[in-house]
Amino acid sequence: MLKQVIVVEGKSDIQRIAQAVEADCIATEGFTLRKGVIDMIRVAYEKRGIIILTDPDTAGERIRRVLTKKFPNAQHAFVPRDEAFANDDIGIEQASPESIRRALSTLHVESLESSNEFSMVDLVRHGLSGMPDSATRRAIIGAKLGIGYGNGKQFLYRLNHYGITRDAFEEAVNS
């Protein structure tokens, strides 16, 4: 049983999590984030810690940003987009139990201060920005680093705020 409570978007996500790991979960039930849901998440955050595991889509990223502002020491897990897509739908409920376990094995806490280790020059140098296949390359490298997919700006932010080291980055890019 995981100590932390996993925060997901919906009840189908909770059912899929149960197939992967033994953990308590809270569903946000969309991005309106009702007060009662926020209160439940706050109690879990203060008593046990939370892991934010939202869908790898625009709505999921929006929910993640809102939750991160409210709960700055939350841990983050990311299922890669290509591992969360089935039946013309994207979401945690589409991910395999193995993909979920892999995501939960690579947790990150967002730092309020940027490491400034990486710049756009690094992204361009490694074909992660400014190239026709940059989005695909970011998805692959994001999956290897456990930081998920993001556009160039989001990806750079995650590199600098999720404790990614230069060595880990270089290893992911070169493998």
Where are these regions (language model features)?
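TOPRIM fold recognition
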Residues: 19, 23, 31-175
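Short glycine/serine/threonine-biased micro-segments
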Residues: 8, 28, 58
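Short active-site oxyanion
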Residues: 1-5, 48-51
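Short, flexible loop segments at the rims of nucleotide/cofactor-binding pockets, characterized by
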Residues: 2-3, 27-32
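Short, polar loop motifs at secondary-structure junctions
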Residues: 10-13
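Phosphate-handling DNA/RNA-contact segment within nucleic-acid enzymes
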Residues: 1-3, 15, 37-40
